């Protein structure tokens, strides 16, 4: 007789006719329509969405979304814009999400026009840093910031505090087709900064770039949840970042640690498959390691 090391058996799930971004991150090649993922799907994780709020009653959230706090100063504890609901859907929607079993938390810092102040954004960030330990997230916490403004040491400092508290932070690189080092929180080194790609595996023409960009993810023509209870297709690095936040929750659910998670995604990502990427920008498309072709 012999005794062999017991292996952990996991269940692989598939979603047919998935949004192209989900299919892309579980495939080696573009053009697929199936999202393949481990059925753990972010169980035991939480995802903070620092944005315009979330329409928490959207059926695609299955009761997993909660409105926590409003720092936008508008007194409206919901999503008056749609942006935050869309982002949340990509992180953790049942149909449109990367991590379909994560818990979603809305921290509102932008109003119905998608605007907010640095002080409000920083207050929301500080709230997340302090609140995370009080939530039931045994496998870990991710934070998504699909927003940005001019370079700000105060915003970057608040972002660094999120990561030093042991939370994974994904941020949009920005949509100015310029170097992301000139905006915040994209320029914060400890954040995982995300540029956008399109269906043809090309860097989106609007995407910011540069040495502060860590990863690339689908961002153009992304279908997700909207604040009217329906769906909408929109584009931006705002849509790319939640693919990374969702993948962060997915990997945490599988037992990865927050420490070094952005580097782990770089390691697991597809290298040099995206066209039109400047030489000083990481050409790494995120991948969950599940898809075969």
UniProtKB/Swiss-Prot annotation:
InterPro entries given in the database record: PCSK9_ProteinaseK-like (IPR034193), Peptidase_S8/S53_dom (IPR000209), Peptidase_S8/S53_dom_sf (IPR036852), Peptidase_S8_Asp-AS (IPR023827), Peptidase_S8_His-AS (IPR022398), Peptidase_S8_Ser-AS (IPR023828), Peptidase_S8_subtilisin-like (IPR050131), Peptidase_S8_subtilisin-rel (IPR015500)
EC number: 3.4.21.-
Any GO BP: proteolysis
SUPFAM superfamilies from the UniProt entry: Subtilisin-like (SSF52743)
Source domain of life: Eukaryota
Pfam families according to UniProt: Peptidase_S8 (PF00082)
Keyword ATP-binding carried by entry: no
Enzyme kind, highest EC tier: hydrolase
Residue numbers annotated as active site: 51, 83, 238
Disulfide bridge map: 46-137, 192-262
GO molecular function: serine-type endopeptidase activity
Temperature dependence: Thermostable.
Residue ranges annotated as propeptide in the record: 1-12
Matching Gene3D superfamilies: Peptidase S8/S53 domain (3.40.50.200)
Keyword Coiled coil listed: no
Domain Peptidase S8 per the UniProt entry, residue ranges: 19-293
Alphabetic keyword roster: Disulfide bond, Hydrolase, Protease, Serine protease
Cited CDD domains: Peptidases_S8_PCSK9_ProteinaseK_like (cd04077)
Reported function: Serine proteinase.
Membership in a protein family: Belongs to the peptidase S8 family.
Protein name in UniProt: Proteinase T
Organism annotation: Parengyodontium album
């Amino acid at each position: 007789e012999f005794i062999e090391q017991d292996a952990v058996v996991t269940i692989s799930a598939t979603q047919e006719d998935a949004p192209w971004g989900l299919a892309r991150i579980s495939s080696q090649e573009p053009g697929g329509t199936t999202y393949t993922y481990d059925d753990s799907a972010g169980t035991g994780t939480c995802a903070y969405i620092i944005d315009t709020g979330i329409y928490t009653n959207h059926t695609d959230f299955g009761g997993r979304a909660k409105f926590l706090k409003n720092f936008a100063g508008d007194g409206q504890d919901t999503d008056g814009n749609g942006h935050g609901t869309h982002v949340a859907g990509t992180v953790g929607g049942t149909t449109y999400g990367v991590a379909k079993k994560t818990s979603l938390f809305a921290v509102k810092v932008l109003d119905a026009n998608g605007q907010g102040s640095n002080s409000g954004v920083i207050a929301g960030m500080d709230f997340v840093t302090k609140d995370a330990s009080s939530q039931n997230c045994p496998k870990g916490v991710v934070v998504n910031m699909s927003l940005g403004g001019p370079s700000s040491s105060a915003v970057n400092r608040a972002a660094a505090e999120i990561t030093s508290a042991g939370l994974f932070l994904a941020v949009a690189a920005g949509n100015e087709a310029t170097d992301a080092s000139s905006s915040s929180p994209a320029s914060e080194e400890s954040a995982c900064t995300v540029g956008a790609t399109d269906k043809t595996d090309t860097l989106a023409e609007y995407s910011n770039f540069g040495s502060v960009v860590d990863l690339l993810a689908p961002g153009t023509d992304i279908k997700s949840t909207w604040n009217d209870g329906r769906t909408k297709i929109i584009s931006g690095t705002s849509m790319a970042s939640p693919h990374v936040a969702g993948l962060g929750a997915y990997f945490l659910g599988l037992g990865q640690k927050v420490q070094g998670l952005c580097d782990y995604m770089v390691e697991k990502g597809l290298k040099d498959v995206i066209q039109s990427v400047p030489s000083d920008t990481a050409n790494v498309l995120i991948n969950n390691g599940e898809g075969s072709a």
